[in-house]
Amino acid sequence: MKIVVITSSPHPHDESTSIYLADRFTKGATQAGHEVFTFDAANSDTHPCRGCDQCHMDGPCIWKDDIENTLMPKMLEADLLVLTTPLYYFGMSAQLKTIVDRFYSRTGKLHGKKSILMATAYNRDDWTMSALVDHYDTLVRYMEWQDAGKVLGIGCGSRSLVEHSKFGDMAEQMGAKL
């Protein structure tokens, strides 16, 4: 299976809680024989959708950045897309939202894929991820994707907290069982 993992934390790799989940997922998926490509949205040349409709929802996008030149070709070939984000004000990071908005340029061509959501948050209330999950579920429905699972790391406000939680194992097992 071809998998694209999109990370979106602006924190350094070794400090990020959501990238930790992405790394653990990748470890499991790679060991299971899957081909994994990781795109770091926070440290790439990306531009937001301008809504100009030059792509006519069928590409290409007017922006010739890392989304168009690197990520989009990989996404079009992928069977599974993994969206990873720290929770920022009860939603996805701005870095991931920039990527999601650019799905517009290939809406129809991205239909039919599987997807996974992985997110981390400091807060541990049971409602912490509700708005993010609602957004993701709506995206899955609109894009005609199949939700392949979620890892919602509540109470993971630091790298140490996520490393000592159950969520890393959950992410790795999710990758291994694909």
Which residue stretches match the model-derived regions?
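Short, glycine-/small-residue-rich phosphate/pyrophosphate-handling segment
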Residues: 94, 107-150
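A charged, well-structured terminal subsegment
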Residues: 136-154, 158, 162-165, 172, ...
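N-terminal beta1-alpha1-beta2 submodule of the flavodoxin-like/Rossmannoid cofactor-binding fold
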Residues: 1-84, 90-101, 105, 168-178
